[in-house]
A protein has these predicted regions:
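Cysteine-centered catalytic environments shared across enzyme families
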Residues: 1-147
């Protein structure tokens, strides 16, 4: 399973990167608080970026708007397009996934339209963390969680 992490707290980012490195996950992208890790046993691209922004996706997905259904560059261009954008991409992206997209220093994160892919988050005075592993939210937020 790939991992997606966003946090605006550098200490939390360091803690979570330490956990990920112990699990021998390979980082595909890391900048501006967003980090994307590749699937461990499947060789697949889950991140595309250029000077204007980035798109990172985790889960199992296919894009129904291209001859190559796994072309992140096409997804990225469609997200940037004034004619298409997020709603268009969500309608043409199938599967169980979470997608993070940065353009113009704005972060957008969404999951598949059926909400089958779980993302967890914490927003507090110390910062924000979004990840696809609940354990990691608890690890950095120091909150008491019911069992």
């Amino acid at each position: 399973m790939g991992k997606l992490l966003f946090t605006n707290n550098q200490d939390w980012e360091n803690i979570l990167r330490g956990i990920y490195s112990k699990n021998e996950l390979n980082k595909n992208y890391s900048s501006n608080g967003l980090t994307c890790y590749a699937k461990r046993y499947v060789d697949s691209e889950n991140c595309y970026f250029d000077n204007d922004g980035v798109v990172a996706i985790i889960g199992t997905w296919a894009y129904l708007n291209d001859d190559n259904p796994f072309n992140l560059n096409v997804i990225y261009q469609d997200l940037k397009s004034e004619d298409k954008g997020v709603d268009y991409v969500r309608k043409h992206l199938i599967g169980s996934y979470a997608l993070a997209y940065i353009q113009d220093n704005k972060l957008r994160i969404f999951v598949d339209e059926c909400h089958t892919y779980a993302l967890y988050y914490y927003i507090g005075r110390e910062g924000v963390v979004v990840t696809n592993t609940y354990y990691h939210v608890e690890k950095v937020s120091k909150q008491e969680f019911d069992e």
